[in-house]
């Protein structure tokens, strides 16, 4: 029976890893559909290459930073318990690789290709796993200290803060240091519209992310005996809440409609194992509204050129999710309890602060040492031709 349980657990978390791996296709198509046609190839290549670099760096360095264990032992030892530790690495890698995928959407259309790969390596090798180890592996006694002060540890079941808020708040200084796309905000005060190049591809990306998210959340249990239907239904309710609110507040704009469910899912990750489904619905509704309001503010009023709105979507909705777990996870609001609002505020603030510092240091250093932004000429030409020497539809542009 023990062998059967080990095999089932390995299969369970492997399937979770595959589902979250598929989410990276969602990141790619969401970005492809949002950017202009001259940057579509770049969007696809970036996500795949970022994932590949993340895999190597997380295997060699990042996983050890987070969990204090490495893979520099014999294959016989690695294969123990049906290779559970290896597939656990695979699953957690897909989370780590989401960080550069999130950042990619914010810096799209004008970031240099190679400096971003260096940033990916540093972020996935150290910046992200440092906080991951604090939140999920009791590093440095931070969780014990939070529990001493508040009575409970910081709770983040599936990464509202650890993954999404950290990714979004790293992206914010990256976007600001990079600056806006050429002529996005004109000297006369007007804003040049850059509408999505393909709503169908944007929608495809959103749907792939939505489906994969159920692996992201449900399989965060990591073993089969800890699986909970509550996590699945809470994820569903937050998703639809975000969709409906974004539909209403975004005035039926398809970009908002397809990002609304993602906002809800980002926010519910932290407390999806604790909340009542109606609480999850409220969390998703708030997240959908938060995304629409803050995306509009950042783009139009504050003139922060965050192309996919990754700071509102992941940074702010992830922050809300960390806090919401302490509100709607409480027994007084129908949750399972065992969570504390003060603990959630402390853990969330720590994650946000670390991400801001990490983003500022990594992208600030790269800006000084090698530059992070394309020239106006390269940007005008587009990243597809500038970096990859081919456009998304060469057959339509050149007579062979």
Name each model feature, range by range:
Residues 1-400:
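Hydrophobic alpha-helical transmembrane bundles of multi-pass membrane proteins
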């Amino acid at each position: 029976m023990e062998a059967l349980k080990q095999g089932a657990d390995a299969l369970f978390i492997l399937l979770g890893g595959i589902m979250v791996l598929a989410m990276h296709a969602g990141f790619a198509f969401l970005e492809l559909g949002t950017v202009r046609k001259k940057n579509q190839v770049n969007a696809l290549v970036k996500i795949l290459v970022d994932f590949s670099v993340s895999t190597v760096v997380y295997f060699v360095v990042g996983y050890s930073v987070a969990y204090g264990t490495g893979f520099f032992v014999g294959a016989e030892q690695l294969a123990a318990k049906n290779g559970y530790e290896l597939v656990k690495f695979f699953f957690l890698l897909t989370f780590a690789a989401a960080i550069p995928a999130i950042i990619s959407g914010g810096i799209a259309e004008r970031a240099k290709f190679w400096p971003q790969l260096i940033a990916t390596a540093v972020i996935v090798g150290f910046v992200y796993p440092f906080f991951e180890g604090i939140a999920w592996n009791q590093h440095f006694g931070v969780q014990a200290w939070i529990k001493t002060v508040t009575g409970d540890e910081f709770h983040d079941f599936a990464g509202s803060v650890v993954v999404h808020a950290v990714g979004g708040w790293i992206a914010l200084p990256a976007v600001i240091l990079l600056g806006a796309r050429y002529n996005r905000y004109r000297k006369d005060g007007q804003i040049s519209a850059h509408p999505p190049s393909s709503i169908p591809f944007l929608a495809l990306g959103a749907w792939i992310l939505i489906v994969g998210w159920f692996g992201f959340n449900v399989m965060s249990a990591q073993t089969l005996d800890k699986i909970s239907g509550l996590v699945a239904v809470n994820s569903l309710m937050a998703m639809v809440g975000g969709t409906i609110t974004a539909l209403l507040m975004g005035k039926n704009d398809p970009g908002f409609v397809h990002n609304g469910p993602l906002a809800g899912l980002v926010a519910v990750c932290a407390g999806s194992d604790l909340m009542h489904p109606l609480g999850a619905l409220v969390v998703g509704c708030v997240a959908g509204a938060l995304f629409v309001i803050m995306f509009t503010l950042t783009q139009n009023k504050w003139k922060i050129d965050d192309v996919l709105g990754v700071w509102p979507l992941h940074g702010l909705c992830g922050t809300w999710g960390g806090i919401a777990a302490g509100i709607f996870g409480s027994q007084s609001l129908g949750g399972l309890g065992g969570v504390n609002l003060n603990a959630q505020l402390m853990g969330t603030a720590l994650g946000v602060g670390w991400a801001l510092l990490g983003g500022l240091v990594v992208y600030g250093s790269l800006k000084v040492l090698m530059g992070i932004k394309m020239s106006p000429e390269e940007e005008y030409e587009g990243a597809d031709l500038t970096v990859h020497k081919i456009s998304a539809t060469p057959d339509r542009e050149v007579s062979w």
